[in-house]
Amino acid sequence: MNLIYVGDAMCSWCYGFVQPLDALLADPREAAPLQLALVMGGLRPFTTEPITPTRADELVGYWHRVAEASGQPFTAAPKTALHSPGFVYDTEPAARATVTVRSLWPQHVWRYFKTVQHAFYAAGRNVTEPEVLADVAEQLGLPRSEFGKAFASQEMRDLTLRDFEQSQSWGVRGFPTLIAEEGDHLHLVGSGFMALPALRERLALWTSAHDHAH
């Protein structure tokens, strides 16, 4: 099965979805052989206004719900990146960094995406900063200078925009969204956080319906 995952590295429910998706990738069962393609949806790209302390506190409250549902670790206020002075919640750089790794080192893209999420949510690092995104690349053994040069290129900016436009053209309204790809046909598997049993159930339903259609 070919699965398209539309998400964002700075989307808390996408971060919450890491463990169910990792478990599925490790043991795809009926979905085997499973291929996962990452598309960056664009949560808040090109934001320029710094986040207010009130809004930062609201988002941290929202993160508590994700933590409860998923068991994922989160930094507590006021040690989050959100609470750093002048933080701007621009999701384009992290998306572009992921697209850069997908383009140059595709076998590492899922690990990179997850590690950026962990850096932001669990370690409180500001992943809107190119140096932090390069740190993550280096952490995974990728060449920092090659990453940095590609990340800053117009080509990667354009490819990232293309991802955002692709997501919009599919009518994706929220993240994470999983889409099954069969030839030229796309089928929505699910949108929003799903625990592993629900995720397997959705895939089994789709696989069953697909088998009956053939």
Which role fits each region the language model picked out?
Residues 18-120:
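Structural alpha/beta surface segment adjacent to cysteine/selenocysteine redox centers
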Residues 6-10, 16-30, 34, 115-214:
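C-terminal cap of thioredoxin/glutaredoxin-like
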